[in-house]
Amino acid sequence: MRDTMEILRTENIVKYFGEFKALDGVSISVNKGDVTLIIGPNGSGKSTLINVITGFLKADEGRVYFENKDITNKEPAELYHYGIVRTFQTPQPLKEMTVLENLLIGEINPGESPLNSLFYKKWIPKEEEMVEKAFKILEFLKLSHLYDRKAGELSGGQMKLVEIGRALMTNPKMIVMDEPIAGVAPGLAHDIFNHVLELKAKGITFLIIEHRLDIVLNYIDHLYVMFNGQIIAEGRGEEEIKNVLSDPKVVEIYIGE
């Protein structure tokens, strides 16, 4: 019987780049309100998998389901309407615009990078309700004092928080995050994951790729390990996750990296 808490699942996802099989029958399940982490060496297929899930790549075989609806190969902008949003390893703020404007721009072309919003200067919404919502999100992220700062003047970690803020403007059910603390100082990295836990408590689900296990392990509920385009290990809960990370085959691929 399928887990009634499941919000996302993939079934036997296959993705080719030419003759190279980047994903080889990948099946995962993500429960509602969980923080699920995918790890693996570079080139193991992690980014390809989340690109398929979020519509930035098309699967060659297999299906993706969200809340039991088939969302396979839908465009990112379509997935916004299902409540799925994505943050990127390299933040993509509009650097000439303020922090506040960057949050408001997400309401124009939801599900797309703001860099694709050709008419953003003309169409930035100024309705009081949207501005109030943006300020509440900035306060939550401890960025309200920077609301009028140009995004190009922010630190890398602050830009990552702006990415999260833009995602929150869409009232997401699930946020898919690609290395949210890459290159971020440890203190701010913990701040970011503390925000993740606060959002989890509000019912938001997270699917995350991240290499910095020393920081993230205390924040996750579910772990998948990928290698050569396949899931090679899985653990749910603290004890199972510890067992996975001490598994000789998992240790070997990380030592070999």
UniProtKB/Swiss-Prot annotation:
Keyword set includes DNA damage: no
UniProt record similarity statement: Belongs to the ABC transporter superfamily.
Function per UniProt: Probable component of a branched-chain amino-acid transport system.
Assembly mode: Monomer.
Any one GO CC term of the record: plasma membrane
Record bears the keyword Nucleotide-binding: yes
Keywords: Amino-acid transport, ATP-binding, Nucleotide-binding, Transport
Residue span, ABC transporter domain: 8-253
Domain of life: Archaea
Protein known as: Probable branched-chain amino acid transport ATP-binding protein LivG
PANTHER family in alphabetical order: BRANCHED-CHAIN AMINO ACID TRANSPORT ATP-BINDING PROTEIN LIVG-RELATED, CONSERVED COMPONENT OF ABC TRANSPORTER FOR NATURAL AMINO ACIDS-RELATED
GO molecular function: ATP binding; ATP hydrolysis activity
Record: residues binding ATP: G40, P41, N42, G43, S44, G45, K46, S47
PROSITE patterns reported in the protein's UniProt record: ABC_TRANSPORTER_1, ABC_TRANSPORTER_2
GO BP: amino acid transport
Primary gene name: livG
